[in-house]
Amino acid sequence: MKYITRTVWVLSLVSLFTDAASEMLYPIMPIYLKSIGFSIVLIGILEGVAEATAGFSKGYFGKLSDNAGKRIPFVQIGYAFSAISKPMMAIFIYPIWIFFARIIDRFGKGIRTGARDALLSDEATSETKGKVFGFHRSMDTLGALIGPSLALIYLYFYP
């Protein structure tokens, strides 16, 4: 696996852990939000605005990282936003604060995605691009499998 450089490993592992943390929350999030007073409509609005935030910010911050010529700060800030937002969602009880935390999480995704993908591309040759991106995606998907599994185990023992 010579095409998997240290940078690719680091980005892939960070992606795995971030996705595991996110996917632990998502299955129980609607139940939690409903228990603190969110209506079904408000949950839908929250998720729609959060995903729109990620979608619209990806292009902007991707171009900004290209223009700045620096990718690592965008990746670090993006993952930091996502990491900070997870405990915020658990400790906040007011809908506006939960809304804020969820937007920060998706904003972090928008900040990091373009720069992270550019870093992965920079680490690959034309022959290894598919392998590098495939490896990263598989680690991300593994995180998406681990997260709900850990949540299920936790909820089984601590309902």
Predicted feature locations:
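Transmembrane alpha-helix termini and helix-breaking/packing motifs in multi-pass membrane transporters
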Residues: 31, 35, 146-159
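Cytoplasmic helix-loop-helix junction between adjacent transmembrane helices
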Residues: 101-142
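Helix-loop boundary and gating motifs at the non-cytosolic
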Residues: 1-54
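Helix-loop junctions at membrane interfaces in 12-TM secondary transporters
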Residues: 88-102
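Residue-level signature of mid-helix packing/kink "hotspots" within the transmembrane helices
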Residues: 51-59, 144-145
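Structural signature of the two symmetry-related core transmembrane helices
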Residues: 73-87
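Helix-to-loop junctions at the C-terminal end of transmembrane segments
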Residues: 57-69, 155
